[in-house]
């Protein structure tokens, strides 16, 4: 994963710089990159991406046609990835681009794992508390993980807050052993 991220980062940065400060252009690139990422993950196409007998131009043509309206700059980007034999990294390019975009727009993606489904009001209170703590806009992604027993685990970037019963029991067990 680290290698994929390392290879994808320069492409994502280049696209991000190309989009500039224009919110409409940033959104357009998000759409383009997502479309290309989706296409290259189709199993029938994924096997062709590294096939030595298929030219970069052929690959670019297939991906551009399948991805739909990418515009001239989007198609040029696909050709660049294809000529460098990096089309298989398109999903990672899209992911890194979205990270750069979120950072520039002052948004942090927060993953919330809870033992039970959070109600809308709980999600709103949690988002507000995280906004205050992190000093940025928060984009919540919630999932249910019954193995937590109760409570929740929150991940925002490099920060993890474990308020789950499972986590508390693990810390208690560790304290008793030591």
From Swiss-Prot:
It is found in: Cell inner membrane. It comes from the Bacteria. One of its GO terms (molecular function) is proton-transporting ATP synthase activity, rotational mechanism. The keyword Repressor does not apply. Its main location: membrane. Keywords: ATP synthesis, Cell inner membrane, Cell membrane, CF(1), Hydrogen ion transport, Ion transport, Membrane, Transport. SUPFAM superfamilies: N-terminal domain of the delta subunit of the F1F0-ATP synthase (SSF47928). GO terms for cellular component: plasma membrane; proton-transporting ATP synthase complex. NCBIfam families: ATP_synt_delta, PRK05758.2-2. Belongs to the ATPase delta chain family. This is ATP synthase subunit delta. It comes from Halorhodospira halophila (strain DSM 244 / SL1) (Ectothiorhodospira halophila (strain DSM 244 / SL1)). The gene is atpH.
């Amino acid at each position: 994963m680290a290698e994929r991220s390392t290879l994808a980062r320069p492409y994502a940065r280049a696209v991000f710089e190309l989009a500039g400060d224009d919110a409409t252009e940033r959104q357009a690139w998000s759409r383009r990159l997502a479309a290309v990422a989706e296409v290259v993950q189709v199993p029938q196409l994924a096997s062709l991406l590294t096939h030595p007998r298929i030219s970069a131009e052929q690959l670019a043509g297939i991906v551009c046609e399948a991805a739909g309206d990418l515009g001239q700059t989007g198609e040029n980007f696909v050709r660049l990835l294809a000529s460098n034999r990096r089309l298989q990294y398109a999903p990672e390019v899209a992911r890194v681009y979205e990270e750069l975009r979120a950072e520039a727009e002052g948004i942090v993606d927060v993953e919330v794992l809870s033992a039970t489904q959070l109600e809308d009001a709980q999600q709103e209170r949690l988002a507000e508390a995280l906004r205050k703590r992190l000093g940025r806009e928060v984009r919540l992604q919630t999932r249910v993980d019954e193995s937590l027993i109760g409570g929740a685990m929150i991940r925002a970037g490099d920060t993890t807050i474990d308020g789950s019963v499972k986590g508390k029991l693990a810390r208690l067990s560790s304290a008793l052993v030591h």
